[in-house]
From Swiss-Prot:
Annotated protein name in UniProt: ATP-dependent protease ATPase subunit HslU
Localization in the cell: Cytoplasm
Alphabetic keyword roster: ATP-binding, Chaperone, Cytoplasm, Nucleotide-binding, Stress response
Disulfide bridges in this chain: none
Gene source species: Caulobacter sp. (strain K31)
Gene3D superfamilies linked: 1.10.8.60, DNA helicase RuvA subunit, C-terminal domain, P-loop containing nucleotide triphosphate hydrolases
Stated family: Belongs to the ClpX chaperone family. HslU subfamily.
SUBUNIT field: A double ring-shaped homohexamer of HslV is capped on each side by a ring-shaped HslU homohexamer. The assembly of the HslU/HslV complex is dependent on binding of ATP.
Amino acid sequence: MTEFSPREIVSELDRYIVGHTEAKKAVAVALRNRWRRRRVPADLRDEVTPKNILLIGPTGVGKTEIARRLAKLAQAPFLKVEATKFTEVGYVGRDVDQIVRDLVESALSMVRDKRRGGVKAKAEAAAEERILDALTGPGSTAARESFRKKLRAGELDDKEVELQLADTGGGGMFEIPGQPGASVLNLSEMMKSFGGGRTKTHKTTVVGAWAPLIAEESDKLLDQEALTQEALELAENHGIVFLDEIDKVASSSQRGGADVSREGVQRDLLPLIEGTTVSTKYGPVKTDHILFIASGAFHVAKPSDLLPELQGRLPIRVELKGLTRDDLRRILTEPEANLIRQHQALLLTEGVTLVFTEEAIDAVADAAVAVNASVENIGARRLQTILEKVVEEISFTAADRSGETVTVDADYVQARIGALAANADLSRFIL
């Protein structure tokens, strides 16, 4: 779990996301409160529940990006799901309990990776012995030591070996009919529990054998029960769920029809967000202290179209404003992995140096604003479309222009997209 202060979290998010200070502050405080809760007296700890957040803002302003960056910062089990993927219990589709099951899988993966790091040296030694067994046969001989030296020097990397590895795939998945709350079951996992796990012969090179062997040997050294318990505790107390597209399951007051699935999904989300116990194959998980961050554009529906009970369970509301022309310009240049830098890095692999003048950046931002205003406002995503159109010809001929420096100026941008941006009908289909 991260121990960044709210100010540090915001400054970290500033490296990748332009603007939206209020939203950044809200998620930073919510994240810091997880850390604070662990330090309050035990009798009060269970009473401190997370304050769930609702991010409201038009498409392409950075709601999902905030969640993605927060996940990397949090060092906690994180799951991003689209609310539209779920249906109410009894209908075909995934039910919302699957969110918690997926969160537990994420926590297990985190804990397993951390614990594997602790036994890596022993696992590597055991993997080396198994590779030597495959190369020379078991037993300690002079030939084995000779092979060991060659193996460590990398001389045997391309040599093919035959290994017995645990059979992890190919079991097939199926869903129990008539059991709406049941998860999808993996047949190979069921067989493993009956027969103690099957092995399968794999033919691979020495260099390709290292990763699966180290993973298998690490798992033998780990206490699986303790690992599972730690993962469940981590998911319960530090888990974060980002519910995207929540507005798509809100029933607009003007909309007719049955809307069986929309309202049903909201009703199913209520106990999950409020706090319930979900059974998983690793054991029961309480959702009382899982932080939920919901987001939606709310173009058609309004936040008030959500069920009142669900609105009450998302007490912190943050509105993200639409992006201005200055914001779009900053997005092109300020974030660490900005779009222009990405294009420059891609073309540099071909030996082409791409340079954008300040006027060219202004022209791209102006074109994005114009097309967003005349066609459909998709926010910063419009920049990707326009930049792709601008560098399309350069990318196509880059392989033949190694060693060249290509300067993109305002005239070049106008020549590539000027007519398209001006013509609303063409923009609708091309930009």
